[in-house]
């Protein structure tokens, strides 16, 4: 008989989820909404999410074809690297090491507390995307991931503004929570400053923002909700609202669908604007702090 049976595997995945903590899971959390309301919300949101994905993909593919055709005789755009871009910079390697250490400690906490299932939450998935972007050389796949994750950062803002930390009891577990969510902003801003292949869509274009919105809602109302109902684990608050949710109540998912659509569509644009303004501002401050050169006779 195998040492790790099916039951022990399930215990390893979510056996440490304690339903006595508010908003963590359990039968009461799973029954927070009636099945009729949950089904109706899921059908409506999943339908809208699929429409958003299809519309966004249609416009993205059309734009890709137009860019590929270009002027007569032109060649499709290729992802090229300048010689200096091919070399891994020290700052990029340090950021990759810091992110891997932070996420590695977080994964260790999940194993130690038998809550590995929480690694399916969006913030952890975006962290994995950032590790991929820092480790992988620029290519078409990396550019797609970069443009998608730019509009998946609103979860980090919510986690910082309305933290759910009542289950983080191990030493330094709380600190890792904040460090990881701050790093979710550091990596994309660094890649924007680095430039090169990692160029966001124009501020006036919302194709990738719409695609990210559709993918996020589809993931929440399909994968996370189904797994949450089966395991009675409140994955990213799909079963019941968080204790810090300002819209706590039976309609919290309707409110969340509205404000998260707005945030997903606009938050990434604000991050891009901030990166554009922060670069010249930092350069200006450094110039002010720089000591004047001594005149040599």
Curated annotation (Swiss-Prot):
GO terms for biological process: positive regulation of ferroptosis. Signal peptide: none annotated. Residues 72-81 have a biased composition (Polar residues). Keywords: Membrane, Transmembrane, Transmembrane helix. The chain crosses the membrane at residues 40-60, 93-113, 116-136, 142-162, 172-192, 210-230, 262-282. It is a multi-pass membrane protein. It is found in: Membrane. One of its GO terms (cellular component) is membrane. The keyword Transmembrane helix applies. It catalyses: 1-(1Z-octadecenyl)-sn-glycero-3-phosphoethanolamine + 1-octadecanoyl-2-(5Z,8Z,11Z,14Z-eicosatetraenoyl)-sn-glycero-3-phosphocholine = 1-(1Z-octadecenyl)-2-(5Z,8Z,11Z,14Z- eicosatetraenoyl)-sn-glycero-3-phosphoethanolamine + 1-octadecanoyl-sn-glycero-3-phosphocholine. Its main location: membrane. Coiled coil: none annotated. InterPro entries: TMEM164. Residues 65-85 are annotated as: Disordered. It comes from the Eukaryota. Positive regulator of ferroptosis. Belongs to the TMEM164 family. This is Transmembrane protein 164.
